[in-house]
Design a protein with these regions (language model features):
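Transmembrane and membrane-interface helices of multi-pass
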Residues: 2-148
Length: 148
């Protein structure tokens, strides 16, 4: 219980939450940096451009947890991308992959998910814990300072 309280105390600092959420959102891009077979400049741009946009978005709110929830669509896509990187090794999300989600029967889905258990567990640990920290950030009275 003492260790859990220490972790909670760390995430009461809104600046740490800010940097943690940026790291969570850019994680799939960093993973694709190592798996994609494109030129180095394209892979660097694949990290720097989204990171700049996420950073800009997070500066719009004094509580990073609010912006994390506003960016939930990107959190969902990031989680999906990590599972696909585990499954295929490379390639970003394609439209037909979303169509396959709706047309696959339950037996095939169960078999596929059992093979993806490590990736799904990683996504749950990273992004669900991020959602919990986002709620704690919103409920926290401390805000990001304007000088930050």
């Amino acid at each position: 219980m003492k260790h859990f309280k220490k972790i909670l105390d760390i995430f009461k600092n809104q600046q740490i939450v800010f940097w943690t959420f940026l790291a969570m959102l850019i994680l799939p891009n960093v993973m694709m940096f190592f798996t994609e077979s494109t030129s180095t400049i394209v892979r660097i741009a694949g990290i720097v451009f989204p990171l700049g946009l996420y950073w800009l978005a997070f500066t719009l709110s004094s509580k990073p947890g609010k912006m994390f929830w506003w960016l939930f669509f990107f959190v969902f896509l990031d989680a999906f991308q990590i599972v696909l990187l585990y499954l295929y090794g490379e390639s970003p999300i394609a439209v037909d992959m979303f169509l396959n989600l709706t047309t696959t029967n339950p037996t095939e889905t169960t078999e596929l998910l059992s093979n993806l258990l490590p990736a799904v567990l990683f996504v749950v640990v990273v992004y669900v814990s991020g959602m919990v920290v986002a709620v704690l950030s919103i409920l926290n009275k401390e805000i990001l300072q304007p000088t930050f």
